[in-house]
Design a protein with these regions (language model features):
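Transmembrane helix-loop-helix hairpins in multi-pass inner-membrane proteins
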Residues: 1-52, 100-213, 296, 300-354
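Membrane-interface helix starts
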Residues: 15-22, 53-61, 236-251
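Hydrophobic/aromatic residues in alpha-helical transmembrane segments
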Residues: 34, 73-80, 99, 117, ...
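A short amphipathic helical element positioned immediately N-terminal to and/or at the very start
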Residues: 45-51, 121, 227-240
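Membrane-embedded helical hairpins/re-entrant loop segments and their flanking transmembrane helices
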Residues: 74-98, 267-283
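Short, membrane-interfacial amphipathic segments enriched in basic
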Residues: 208-231
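Transmembrane helical segments that form the transport core of multi-pass membrane transport proteins
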Residues: 235-286
């Protein structure tokens, strides 16, 4: 009976986050179908595992790169927070790295990642306005790099490697989503009055529908406007912040992206493909850029499809499925698995305290 109760208690803790686990199943299902598509259509029904990918040297390089990848991801948020005069213990930031990877990869358009970061930062004493600003700045630093460099790489590419993948319909879709991204950033950064009006009208609607009392309406209105103003000030604080913290946040954002792009290089070189590092980085920039517009959880389908099509130019049919699967495994699946465990343990610990 004890064991039965123990199992039931373990399963009961995450029910508040049940939708994330449903999204996880969707993510896994789409990932499986995507890899199968690569195997059938790009790989020509051929697959062979290479023992080089379990060699001691390869695993050593990958483990070092994984550590740096997660470390740089944590440091870029840590220094953004320091630049707006907030200090959160790095161990809490490092835990948040994995939770964010899990949530952002199992929710459409990575929408859950930002919210979970704000939630955990506020739990660590960061005001919601500052937590929202830090999350936005962290994302925007990476977005600037990708949204500027990816179009330039496509435009000035000497080969026709992007022509078969980037059709007119995809270009139209990207332009529309890109415009919406920048419109949202513009409103959030420069038009805080619009946000205040939207929040006010929403609270007023709740009041008219008697979901909240007049007292709560006044309190929520005051708190919301206060946090929006704090959010706006935090963006200014970042631009005027301590140069060493601002520079560090930009530097570690760049290092995070370069570590992300380096997984493919190690995989291909281990399989004896003589491909230049910057050729690999160029393709990875475009693929990561496209993943920002994928509506599926974790960009499943889009990521594998774009990767296999672009890298099939110099990877054999026999290896393309293995290379694509290895890339997703090291850059996404491991982080998602660790994040799921970290989130589960965090919820279970809170459940025990109650």
């Amino acid at each position: 009976m004890k064991y039965k109760e123990r199992i039931l208690s373990l399963l009961a803790v995450p029910t508040r986050f049940a939708k994330f686990y449903l999204f996880l199943l969707l993510f896994l299902g789409l990932s499986f179908l995507s890899i199968y598509f690569v195997y059938k259509k790009i790989g020509g029904n051929s697959f062979a595992f290479d023992k080089q990918l379990i060699s001691f040297d390869f695993l050593t390089y990958i483990l070092i790169l994984l550590f740096l990848y997660f470390l740089f991801d944590g440091l870029r948020l840590y220094f953004v927070l320091r630049s707006i005069n907030e200090k959160v213990p790095f161990k809490d930031i490092f835990k948040l790295v994995f939770i964010n990877i899990f949530i952002s990869n199992v929710t459409p358009l990575a929408t859950g990642g930002g919210f979970v970061q704000i939630f955990y930062l506020t739990k660590n004493g960061v005001p919601m306005g500052k937590a929202s600003a830090a999350t936005l700045i962290r994302t925007f630093l990476a977005v600037i790099f990708l949204f500027v460099s990816a179009p330039l790489i496509v435009i000035f590419s000497k080969s026709e490697q992007f022509a078969s993948f980037l059709t007119d319909n995809i270009y139209t879709y990207i332009i529309i989503i890109l415009a919406l991204y920048f419109l949202a950033f513009y409103v959030v950064v420069f038009k805080k009055r619009y946000i205040c009006c939207i929040v006010y009208l929403f609270l007023r609607l709740l009041r008219k529908m008697h979901f909240i009392s007049h007292r709560r309406f006044c309190r929520y209105k005051f708190k919301s406007i206060k946090q929006i103003i704090l959010f706006s000030k935090s963006l200014a604080w970042f631009l005027k912040g301590d140069i060493k913290f601002v520079a560090s946040s930009i530097f570690f954002t760049f290092m995070f992206l370069m570590s992300l792009f380096s997984f493919s290089a190690i995989i291909l070189w281990e399989l004896s493909y003589a491909v230049g590092y910057f050729d690999i980085v160029g393709l990875q920039v475009v693929i990561t850029f496209l993943m920002y517009f994928a509506p599926t959880p974790g960009a499943s389908g889009v990521a594998e499809g774009a990767y296999s099509v672009l890298f099939s130019k110099f990877v054999s049919q026999n290896d393309i499925t293995l290379v694509t699967l290895s890339w997703r495994f090291f850059t996404i699946y491991i982080g998602v698995f660790i994040g799921m465990i970290v989130l589960y343990r965090d919820l279970f610990r809170k459940g025990k305290k109650r």
